[in-house]
Amino acid sequence: MEIRIRSVPIAVLMRTPGADRDLIRGFAITEGMVVGPRELSEPIDLGEGRWELGLADGVEIDPEQFRRNLYASSSCGVCGKASIDAVLVSAGTLPTGPRVSHHLLERLPGMMLDHQEGFASTGGLHAAALFDAAGHLRIVREDIGRHNAVDKVVGAVEPWPPGESVLVVSGRVSFEVAQKAAVAGIPIVCGVSAASSLAIDLASRTGLTVVGFVRGDRCVVYTGHDRIEP
């Protein structure tokens, strides 16, 4: 998928087709191009995998500021941020809550899996899901790249902002996943595998709660312990 701003190509995403509009909106938000969906209008399908980012009236973006001479690959998700300092510029203030129990968190990956139709069919898709503080599923999206799945979730959030919510991802909590959660204002991120050292560093500096190895009756809280109840 090629994304353009004012006809200027700014990114090529290697993604699984489906929820394309959510992906474009979420990508624009988590990359700091806009501060939220109110600055966006409907993306325009130009055909042949090319899309124009729709901007609300009065919103001006310099496409050269975000133009990238690289592919965001499905494996690494290099999404235009070269350093933690760059992410901190885009990240806002995270909600102080919610406070959730580790018992609640341990149930969420299984609830997400119940809605992973693509994974059930292929065994090859990652997923991301957004839950409220009570553990109710709000959104689930799938993609070959978990960072794309996160963008699809962010782009589908209604109402905005996400507020006191929990993001769950299949696999590890990478730097890109932590980056996207911080910029979108999602305070808790959980993964079924480990968190990377760079993700933990970013989380510590932004106040993000990162929880890994959420499997069965166990989990590891890396950062933001104050949001997790015993």
Question: What do the PLM-derived regions correspond to, one by one?
Answer:
Residues 147-222, 227-230:
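Feature captures the catalytic cores and cofactor-binding loops of soluble hydro-lyases/lyases
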